[in-house]
Regions:
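Walker A/P-loop
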Residues: 6
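The conserved Walker
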Residues: 1
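A glycine- and Lys/Arg-enriched "phosphate-lid" helix/loop adjacent to the NTP-binding pocket
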Residues: 84-128
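Short glycine-rich anion-binding loops that position phosphate/pyrophosphate groups of nucleotides
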Residues: 69-72, 93-95, 143
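ATP-dependent small-molecule kinase phosphotransfer cores
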Residues: 22-71, 76-82, 109
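Post-Walker A helix-loop "phosphate-sensing" segment adjacent to the P-loop in P-loop NTPases
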Residues: 14-23
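NTP-dependent small-molecule kinase module
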Residues: 11, 15, 125-163
Length: 163
């Protein structure tokens, strides 16, 4: 949620010369705007669409996949990611997320039109147990996008992970 996953993912994919997949964009292309899906069909249906997009990306050529912040809350998504992908958590503190959301023009269905620190902390706390089991955690609080990209690329190299 507003950690910069899509921006980082695009730049990392470019740096590594691999394909980039944005799960939210894939869902929007297939099913329409995220907020419309949430309001008309509910979060559970959105998570199913998200899972389908994740599977489609995993079945395509190797690359970097940017997930929505809540993707790992859907058990099937988490299972397939654990089995078939390396998971990187870009950790940004709730206060920084709030600042980014306030500057953004995108309404996040689980946050609403007026983001609050308490709501962000609530989601963050609920999701943290799943985030913390990532293969790699980047403490991105005071890092530029380029620094985060470099740190992930270095980790991939160090682990001898080829995409």
């Amino acid at each position: 949620m507003a950690a910069g996953k899509s921006t980082i993912g695009k730049k990392l994919a470019r740096k590594l010369g691999v394909k980039f997949y944005d799960v939210d964009d894939m869902v929007v292309t297939e099913h329409g705007p995220v907020s419309d899906i949430f309001y008309a069909q509910g979060e559970q249906q959105f998570r199913k669409y998200e899972y389908e997009a994740i599977c489609k990306a995993l079945d395509s050529e190797p690359g970097i996949i940017a997930l929505g912040g809540g993707a790992v809350t859907y058990d099937e998504s988490l299972k397939v990611l654990k089995k078939r992908a390396y998971r990187v958590f870009v950790k940004v503190p709730p206060e920084q997320i709030l600042g980014r959301l306030r500057r953004s023009h995108t309404v996040r269905p689980l946050i609403g039109a007026t983001p609050s620190l308490s709501k962000i902390k609530e989601l963050y706390t609920a999701r943290m147990p799943r985030y913390s089991h990532s293969d790699y955690v980047v403490e991105a609080q005071d890092m530029s996008t380029a620094q985060v990209v470099d740190q992930i690329a270095q980790w991939l190299h160090k682990k001898n992970i080829k995409l």
